[in-house]
Amino acid sequence: MARLTKRRQADTKAIQHLWAAIEIIRNQKQIANIDRITKYMSRVHGMHPKETTRQLSLAVKDGLIVETLTVGCKGSKAGIEQEGYWLPGDEIDWETETHDWYCFECHLPGEVLICDLCFRVYHSKCLSDEFRLRDSSSHWQCPVCRSIKKKHSNKQEMGTYLRFIVSRMKERAIDLNKKGKDSKHPMYRRLVHSAVDVPTIQEKVNEGKYRSYEEFKADAQLLLHNTVIFYGADSEQADIARMLYKDTCHELDELQLCKNCFYLSNARPDNWFCYPCIPNHELVWAKMKGFGFWPAKVMQKEDNQVDVRFFGHHHQRAWIPSENIQDITVNVHRLHVKRSMGWKKACDELELHQRFLREGRFWKSKNEDRGEEEAESSISSTSNEQLKVTQEPRAKKGRRNQSVEPKKEEPEPETEAVSSSQEIPTMPQPIERVSVSTQTKKLSASSPRMLHRSTQTTSDGVCQSMCHDKYTKIFNDFKDRMKSDHKRETERVVREALEKLRSEMEEEKRQAVNKAVASLQGDMDRKGKQLKEKCKEEFVEEIKKLAAQHKQLISQTKKKQWCYNCEEEAMYHCCWNTSYCSIKCQQEHWHAEHKRTCRRKR
């Protein structure tokens, strides 16, 4: 059942200041009473004594500071019982602390509404109308739990996208870790209920623990929540965490806008902007203020504004008024554009994108391309084998025709018989005997030889043409494969050379930096040593001067006589070791004791 309750009341930043005050006072072996804490807070943090007293009482109620009665053992309050304050222990009863202590939206204490499914709490004023509690007897779910409950995505696909976002978060988190304190601070868990950091988020992404994008976004918001609580809303760490959360929300919005664009813009394969998305983006001519019309993709439309991403080198985004948008089918000459090199490159990229659209060509990974190449090569080899098998029966059929019709004098059957014999070069002699024997019945012995030679020449030409086409095709296929292999090998060699060159440059840079640092350190050490010796010499000289002055002053002091009563310089001599500065001192000392011990002759 949902209920409103006060989990905490004291300000988190004031609590940390009070903790520091108590710790410093205790380290000085003193009782951390209200007076000492108030003076410290006023001197260091400029907090008014009344505000210090109020925050201290709230912290005691919240259990963040322990109040005890302590008896003073020294000073003006020795033996007096007084209130003393201590830091709480490290032990926390997590069975009772099931929910956070501060509003997940504004990160402040006060009367909060507790979620029935998670640890989050909210102020009623921080909730929108749709999430506010309608009936106190009903169960209440926070906005985060409701958003997580709405969607469930493919975990494998979601993990791929979230890895890109986490890599961006790690870059920002470097600054956050540099500016922040260690999360292992002894009082950290007293303020932060559910600790989370970027490495934890990355680990959950790698293990596939997120069920939706909203759950991932909730962890990013939790990181901001913890940072604001521990470091303060106006701290530099909180500004970095807000920027980190804002960037994460922007990345998630871009992902929901178009998953294909999000993946390709992060993976960055060759010609990544040219591959079509599903569904396809509308292509337009867009005109920014101060520029001409430029080819672009429409990402989204809102009221009278169009969000476009331009073709070209940088692929920039911009919101363009709808009146500055023209359909891509509009003739370029009507747009009066300045055809610069950048504009031409953008148009070339547009043409490649349109060609990919016509061909239905979508981006595929290298493994898929390699599988397709292997399939194509196996299909081509199978087709070549089938071509050979179909040619052999044709040759046998030619021989059969030749033996059935041996008496015909037309050149076609003989040409067919000879060409068939050229297709099967292992049996030339039987064909030649058959042709000669058939021709001897009608012609002389010389005629068959001439006819055979002519048909042999004709068949050679036909066979040569067929073989030329066949091997030209095979050679072209082999040439294309060699080109692709050479291109991949060249890219690999260039990539390895670049990596090697980069590593060598980094090594040289590191050595140069180390050398410069060592040289600078040597100069600093040498100058520091010289300065130290100079200061030591000056110190010795100064000590000598002071010693001489001191000796001279002592000598001058010894040569003077001093009043026995008030120790001022004496003017009146009484006896061998007694003098006075005035008659008053002489009378006071005389009546007090000197009249009994004076050795002056009367």
From Swiss-Prot:
Residues involved in Zn(2+) binding: 258, 261, 277, 281
Residue location of crosslink Glycyl lysine isopeptide (Lys-Gly) (interchain with G-Cter in SUMO2): 366, 407-408
Protein's cellular compartments: Nucleus; Chromosome
Description of post-translational modifications: Ubiquitinated, leading to proteasomal degradation.
Aromatic cage required for H3.3K36me3-specific binding: region residues: 291-310
One GO-annotated biological process of the protein: negative regulation of extrinsic apoptotic signaling pathway
Pfam families registered for this protein in UniProt: Bromodomain (PF00439), MYND_ZMYND11_ZMYD8 (PF24324), PWWP (PF00855), SAMD1_WH (PF21524), ZMYND11_CC (PF23461)
Keyword tags: Bromodomain, Chromatin regulator, Chromosome, DNA-binding, Isopeptide bond, Metal-binding, Nucleus, Phosphoprotein, Repressor, Transcription, Transcription regulation, Tumor suppressor, Ubl conjugation, Zinc, Zinc-finger
Major location category of this protein: nucleus
Disordered, as annotated region: 366-461
Chain ranges of the SAMD1-like winged helix (WH) domain: 6-82
Zinc finger (PHD-type) in chain: 100-148
Modified-residue entries (Phosphoserine), positions: 421
Residue ranges with Polar residues bias: 435-461
The protein, known as: Zinc finger MYND domain-containing protein 11
Species: Mus musculus (Mouse)
Name of encoding gene: Zmynd11
